[in-house]
Amino acid sequence: MSTRTPLPTVNERDTENHISHGDGRQEVTSRTGRSGARCRNSIASCADEQPHIGNYRLLKTIGKGNFAKVKLARHILTGREVAIKIIDKTQLNPTSLQKLFREVRIMKILNHPNIVKLFEVIETEKTLYLIMEYASGGEVFDYLVAHGRMKEKEARAKFRQIVSAVQYCHQKRIVHRDLKAENLLLDADMNIKITDFGFSNEFTVGSKLDTFCGSPPYAAPELFQGKKYDGPEVDVWSLGVILYTLVSGSLPFDGQNLKELRERVLRGKYRIPFYMSTDCENLLKRFLVLNPVKRGTLEQIMKDRWINAGHEEEELKPFVEPELDISDQKRIDIMVGMGYSQEEIQESLSKMKYDEITATYLLLGRKSAELDASDSSSSSNLSLAKVRPSSDLSNSTGQSPHHKGQRSVSSSQKQRRYSDHAGPAIPSVVAYPKRSQTSTADSDLKEDGVPSRKSGSSAVGGKGIAPASPMLGNASNPNKADIPERKKSPAVPSSNAASGGMTRRNTYVCSERCAADRHSVIQNGKESSLTEVFAYAASPASLCATSTCRLRHQRSMSVSASGHPKMVLPPIDSEGDTFKAITTPDQRTPVASTHSISSATTPDRIRFPRGTASRSTFHGQPRERRTATYNGPPASPSLSHEATPLSQTRSRGSTNLFSKLTSKLTRRLPTEYERNGRYEGSSRNVSSEQKDENREAKPRSLRFTWSMKTTSSMDPSDMMREIRKVLDANTCDYEQRERFLLFCVHGDGHAESLVQWEMEVCKLPRLSLNGVRFKRISGTSIAFKNIASKIANELKL
């Protein structure tokens, strides 16, 4: 991954003790007398020091970016798990705020089983909290990284869900504009959840959009040409790229740089793998059509032969959104028992205020996380041992026929769709706690109080200038109609945001262009230059308007007094681990040689590159031109018209950004652990007392084995000793978070090879074996593959 600057702290103290009003707005109140009420009535006791936001107990940070972070949380009243996106509004300019609220308002009107659901919006003066559905299976991107291409039967199950969700957006007159494997999540049952509507916008038949946004490998040719477009056709092209990626494990169009990629997209030539079926090839030809007028519509594509193979009796049809059931008496009775009145429940649901009442009602329609096989505080947020509902939206009597049979073949569980429309089966024996008198957030969310794993991502916010939307109005508040323009000018983002363009998740936008600034990216129908286009990535002003929210794989660069960059490792996401380690140029460790993770690994099962600039999402606004130079190893040449395997590109950083990092980072003094350059929790510091305390602990059981790299019948403790031995032999730093879980770090940040990952010994009850689970936390896929392969091959299990 490319290196990045440290991220500004999201100020979460603003939310202490706020009152939720009927319109969804929050009023900050005094702290006196509030915390006691929450402690008495919440599941957590007062002794539990975990911070809270509203009715949610925060569990851990699962993502972090320039202006936002994402936390896994548990709804206190129902026990359901959610993802909370916390956005620091003070870091966003008015345009960014406008786009942020547009994203929220669009999410409110989308109700589809394969789209991430919004439950609640909490807004204070400085912070916006979006409580959303938690998809525990991670990204399709990461799934492909771990497994390579899908078999067509599995790809079909996923793709039917994707097409259904995108077609639903189109029939709602919403265009996503940033469809890619990174924005497709998987729930616990391996069902698709489309996320990140930061670039989405309303389209109107007869009017054109002209914003160039999206990830370049997924972008339609008309976007590269600077042409205006209706909307849906750019999503259709992106879906074609996604289909190709699912089936082949590689991208149809790729290049060493943006110029080469653009040429290949405009040429429209791509390689058909020998294993791809004729029906799949024919379907691709309906998606990847250079002329947008001749490109197929999703309604037409839903009738395609490949789409419906094996589903002849359940032909894919447009999703019919059932009427929302807001009168489920069973849920209402439970909420009355929690302390809500019938009147306020009916008022909130009838107006869909997306306040704490709406959220509680919606979450009651979901399977309780307390029935999960493993504790939510488990270190692996990708554990598939969790069993959660796919959605609260499907209705057994009202859903489209295709949803009955669209379960992924990789899932061994039946889809669970606890409906908000027909009413879920809620166990009557569950004792729900009463709510506190006011919705409080008695949290002191210090960075050292909530240890979090820093992860690279784009900033969260708006996406450049977009045309006024009749549906969305000009409101800056997602819970109200139009409100007056903000009087206070937002804080100017610091220059350290400039490095955000170096990671794959950063988004830049060529906003709706006037004649004066069209030349910034397209000049006379031609691309001006690669360096000019990528100058947007280095522009702080550009990045303050970005909004992508899977905030992961963060690395920070520090500049020493001598001018040599040092790599700052992020803090560990466990109790009290707030130390960091620095790898100086003198402490660089050699890059591991490349090996395949297992003998069964084929060239198809290769890693996607994450850090390349060309893999980032575009939404670049016209900025002052700058040149950007790139370092790192030269990329190997690839064949023209060939589909490039997703591991063959290399991360490229922008060296002229280093000077921008100095101001923030030179103020920070290294800690004792940083001076030592090694984690305290390495094997050299594991005390015998700790081993005695954990001697009786048992490995976590996993139902699924797709994240396992090796299995063994050896005793788990002996396996851990062998793992530590191999890590030491490969000069890896590591910290033992749990009895059978290690957090590992390897690489030289100066060479962009720093990798962080987890290794966990897990029990595989179905196989009567133990396995070693590898999970990448940050770093490029190639660097992770190198070190993971080397370690896996050296383990003598």
From Swiss-Prot:
A biological process from GO: regulation of G2/M transition of mitotic cell cycle
Keywords: ATP-binding, Cell membrane, Cell projection, Cytoplasm, Kinase, Membrane, Nucleotide-binding, Phosphoprotein, Serine/threonine-protein kinase, Transferase
Disulfide pattern: none
Biased composition annotated in UniProt, kind: Basic and acidic residues: 11-28, 669-678, 689-699
GO (cellular component) term, any one: cytoplasm
Residues annotated for ATP binding in this entry: I62, G63, K64, G65, N66, F67, A68, K69, V70, K85
Post-translational modification: Phosphorylated at Thr-211 by STK11/LKB1 in complex with STE20-related adapter-alpha (STRADA) pseudo kinase and CAB39. Phosphorylation at Thr-617 by PRKCZ/aPKC inhibits the kinase activity.
Molecular function per GO: ATP binding; protein serine kinase activity; protein serine/threonine kinase activity; tau-protein kinase activity
Regulation: Activated by phosphorylation on Thr-211. Inhibited by phosphorylation on Thr-617.
Quaternary structure, from the entry: Interacts with MAPT/TAU. Interacts with DLG5 (via coiled-coil domain). Interacts with STK3/MST2 and STK4/MST1 in the presence of DLG5. Interacts with YWHAB, YWHAG, YWHAQ and YWHAZ. Interacts with PKP2 (via N-terminus). Interacts with CDC25C. Interacts with KSR1.
Family to which this protein belongs: Belongs to the protein kinase superfamily. CAMK Ser/Thr protein kinase family. SNF1 subfamily.
Protein name: MAP/microtubule affinity-regulating kinase 3
Organism annotation: Rattus norvegicus
